[in-house]
């Protein structure tokens, strides 16, 4: 009977009757990461969820995100702590009219299977709001973690507000085949820029040039970076979208034009390092070329969140934005997925399909 009716029906009946029945599974971090994250740093535990109050929804995760910030941020939490992260989840019971059953939300619920929250309340500081996914069929709802979610908005606002890229300018992107980088390159092409990417394999570079329309892409593991820049950016570089940091960023910033703009988005090249690497001094390039270098967190545009999502949705519908996903499977494989993404297994966005 239960199987025939489906989980949603069962959850609604129990929740309307006020009987708490749903048991959530969640990852708790017990040990700070050293080097790559390990399964033994975590424990999966179960908790029984309480009864829905007015305004609350119960969700069931369908896709969980693995993102580089997870490796970098956990040191800021007191242990043990619930693992942070975004997810796309289905609303399976609701006492909030704006968030009806059957719809999908993107939320910062962490690595857990089921969640109760009031999506109408403002998010905790540093977290993103819980948002209803627009109708994106025939595309998968997992795009709410990628081009139509946090990485998509990072690309949109980082490029438009920080780089302020203009038609005819040359932009260089590191981490170019990942979720943010591959998206930045496509928006920059749509603006009319020359786009040069650096990524970690020949296959990724071929994907960037042939599928996404990058003008040039180079394998940073095998290329001479200076020669690659001369070859790929004959008019030098106006904008640099920095996803990786380290020596490659110094080399690129030394190859920029006067008044170039650098969007410092992340520094994944050192996230797994306990001791931060030393790189060649950057100040001469910044001073003599009068560069504008600005770090940013995408949360800066939390009040304009929908603007970014809608702009990316428009590009998707116009056929100007392609996407690729590396899909891992199973709630038990979250750590493998996180490590795989940090090692560069993904082209495009890395996500985990929960079931
Ligand atoms: N500021 C913000 O608000 C914000 C928001 C989202 C993301 N970010 C940052 O943006 C960057 C990209 O994030 P994402 O979500 O799009 O991840 P991603 O690029 O989809 O995945 C991470 C990629 O990093 C690359 N990588 C790993 N080790 C590297 C190394 N030593 N040197 C160069 N590249 C390396 C790998 O690709 P390869 O095969 O090419 O090495 C891997 O696929 C990260 O630094 C992240 O922290 C910042």
Residue ranges and their predicted role:
Residues 48-66, 70-112:
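Glycine-rich beta-strand-centered segment in the early N-terminal region that forms part
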Residues 145-223:
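Mid-domain Rossmann-like dinucleotide-binding core that forms the NAD(H)/NADP(H) cofactor-binding site
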């Amino acid at each position: 009977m239960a199987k025939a009716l489906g989980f949603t029906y069962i959850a609604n009946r129990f929740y309307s009757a006020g009987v708490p029945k749903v048991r959530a599974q969640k990852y708790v971090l017990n040990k700070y990461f050293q080097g790559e994250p390990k399964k033994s740093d975590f424990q999966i535990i179960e908790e029984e969820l309480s009864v829905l109050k007015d305004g609350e929804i119960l969700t069931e995760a369908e896709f969980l995100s693995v993102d580089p910030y997870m490796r970098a941020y956990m040191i800021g939490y007191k242990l043990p702590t619930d693992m942070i992260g975004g997810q796309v989840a289905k609303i399976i019971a609701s006492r909030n009219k704006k968030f009806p059953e059957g719809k999908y939300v993107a939320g910062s619920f962490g690595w857990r299977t089921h969640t109760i929250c009031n999506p109408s309340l403002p998010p905790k500081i540093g977290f993103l709001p819980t948002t209803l996914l627009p109708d994106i069929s025939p595309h998968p709802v997992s795009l709410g973690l990628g081009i139509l979610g946090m990485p998509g908005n990072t690309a949109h606002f980082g490029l438009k507000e920080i780089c302020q890229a203009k038609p005819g300018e040359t932009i260089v992107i590191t981490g170019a085949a990942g979720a943010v980088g591959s998206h930045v390159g496509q928006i920059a092409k749509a603006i009319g820029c020359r786009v040069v990417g650096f990524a970690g394999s020949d296959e990724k570079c071929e994907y960037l040039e042939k599928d996404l329309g990058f003008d040039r892409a180079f394998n940073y593991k095998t290329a001479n970076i200076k020669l690659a820049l001369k070859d790929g950016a004959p008019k030098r570089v106006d904008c640099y979208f920095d996803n990786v940091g380290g020596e490659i960023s110094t080399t690129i910033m030394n190859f920029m034009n006067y008044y170039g703009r650098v969007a410092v988005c992340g520094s994944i090249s050192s996230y797994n390092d306990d001791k931060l690497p030393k790189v060649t001094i950057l100040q001469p390039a910044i001073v003599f070329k009068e560069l504008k270098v600005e770090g940013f967190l995408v949360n800066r545009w939390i009040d304009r969140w929908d603007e970014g999502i809608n702009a990316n949705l428009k590009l998707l519908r116009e056929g100007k934005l392609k996407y690729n996903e590396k899909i891992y499977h199973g709630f038990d494989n979250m750590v493998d997925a996180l490590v795989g993404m940090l090692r560069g297994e993904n082209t495009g966005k890395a996500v985990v399909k929960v079931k």
